[in-house]
Design a protein with these regions (language model features):
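Chalcogenol-based redox active-site neighborhoods
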Residues: 1-176
């Protein structure tokens, strides 16, 4: 994977390695994911949906795994969630019906993050990797955890219409 530094000069941003190219046009399989609001969400249903996948959020107390900053695209999950939070009304205004964050972390872990970050939308847990495996999402491992590489899916009526891997700064949002 080609890499380049960004941010304060010590973070590594991934470049498109083609590992998400197969997703455009794909129909989402019917898989129930537990949401932080207690519901079960099936991404194959519903209208215009945006799902941003992220590796993990760090706990309020504690830090990232050792070497986290050297992993391309790993740093910035909290900022990414806050960016979607800050643009939530704007996204609804252009027709987005559903917005979700997605990680392989447990629902309990995600609940703490959703509350702490004041997210107006639920986070989805794929701790069993059912959706990740079905869609062949790019994954990586660190300290015994299997994590999703950062990406954003724009889904319309269960079909992936657009995939983006570039969303690293609070001012950047995937184009609708």
């Amino acid at each position: 994977m080609a890499e380049k530094e960004f941010g304060p000069g010590y973070l590594v941003m991934p470049e498109d390695d083609g590992k998400v190219a197969h997703l455009s046009g794909l129909q989402i399989p019917s898989i129930g994911l537990t949401a932080t609001d207690g519901s079960t969400v099936d991404l194959s249903e519903g209208g215009l949906t945006v799902v941003y996948a992220y590796p993990r959020t760090s706990p309020a107390i504690g830090g990232a795994p050792e070497g986290w900053d050297a992993i391309p695209g790993a740093r910035g999950c909290t900022s990414q969630s806050c960016t979607f939070r800050d643009h939530f009304a704007e996204m609804k205004g252009v027709g987005v019906e559903r917005l979700f964050g997605l990680s392989t972390q447990s629902t309990d872990y995600q609940k703490e993050a959703a509350e702490r970050l004041h997210l107006p939308f639920p986070l989805l847990a794929d701790s069993s990797l059912a959706l990740c495996r079905a869609l062949e999402l790019p994954l990586f491992e660190v300290e015994g955890m299997t994590l999703i590489k950062r990406l954003t899916l724009i889904i319309d009526n269960g079909r992936i219409e657009h995939v983006s891997i570039q969303c690293f700064h609070r001012s950047e949002m995937p184009r609708m």
